[in-house]
Every structure is written in C-alpha cells, then in structure tokens.
Amino acid sequence: TPYNPFDPSSLSLMDAFTPPSWTDEGLAKFILGTDGQGRDMLATILYGSRISLIVGFSAVIFALVLGVGLGLSAGYFGGKYEMLVMRFTDVQLTVPSILMALLVDGIARGIISREMHDEMAIYVLIFAIGISEWPQFARVSRAATLVEKNKDYVSASTIIGVSNIIIMFKHILP
C-alpha cells in the first residue's frame, strides 16, 4: 500500500475514536473514523482485505485448475478412471468444506514444523480451501465434457489424429 497516508501499524492516541467524516465531530481525513488506538479504519480495512482477496482468488484458481482438470479428463476418457474420479468427488462432497479445511490444516501442522507453518500459513490456507472446493468444478466440467465429446468436430479431430490433450484443451474446454 504505497499510496496509503496512514500506516496501519502506527498509533495516534490523540485521534482515538474519531467518528466518521460524515458526522459533525468527524474529520475529513478519516473517512470511516478511527479505532481506539487512533488507526484509520478505512486504511485498516483496505490493508486487511488485501490478504483476504489474495487468499480467496488463489484458492478459487487452485480449485478451478484441479477440478476442471480432473472433470475434463474423467469425462473425456470415461471408464474406470471416470468412475474412480467421480466416486472420490462424491465422497468429498459429503464432507463439509470447513471440516476438510481443518483436516488439511491439521495434517500440514503434523508434517511441517511450527516455524515453517507460521511462514507458510497463507499457502496452507489456500491449499486447504482449494482442496475442499474442487469437486464442484469437477462435476460441472465433467458434465460439459460429456456433452461436447460426442459432437462432430471432436470426432473429426480424433479421426485426423489429433492428440487427446489437444482435443481436451483446444476443442472441449473452451
């Protein structure tokens, strides 16, 4: 936050509990007011939301890549692989997401030392959320793959010898 005039870690007890700027007692420089230690509330919210947005977007991208990859390959190849992936997906969908995230975090705490876990907490959180949310993406992408793989342009690509990877990612996925 290079353009933030208010450092969230600095205190100003003289500005403690300043009301928002739209009230009569409020100051224009503190749009949402200040907390008990004089920190600007808007700056604190923006500073905190940065981490939340990074974790949220990263977890969704991780779940999307994992779920679409597994769903696309399961729908395209079919057979026992599809059955295995979709049964695993069904089992994971029965476990609540928060419980799965706690399980992943607990396993990470058991594997990684405490100091290392403190440094990697955001990455563990992204992984835990992504692992608990990928089945929704897998089901949707598998269903779309089953619809698309029987169309003429996919059959034509198979006949002329295009590889399965190219068919999946250039013809079916888009």
Across the structure, where does each feature detected by a protein language model lie?
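Short, functional N-terminal and low-complexity linear motifs
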Residues: 8-11, 53-57, 109, 122-124, ...
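Generic hydrophobic transmembrane alpha-helix motif, especially the helices
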Residues: 31, 41, 62, 66-67, ...
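Gly/Trp-centered helix-boundary motif
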Residues: 1-68, 73, 80, 94, ...
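Amphipathic cytosolic juxtamembrane alpha-helices at the membrane-cytosol interface
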Residues: 39-54, 58, 78-86, 146-150, ...
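Residue-level detector of alpha-helical transmembrane segments in integral membrane proteins
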Residues: 12-13, 89, 128, 167
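Interfacial helix-capping/hinge residues at the ends of transmembrane alpha-helices
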Residues: 71, 101, 154-155
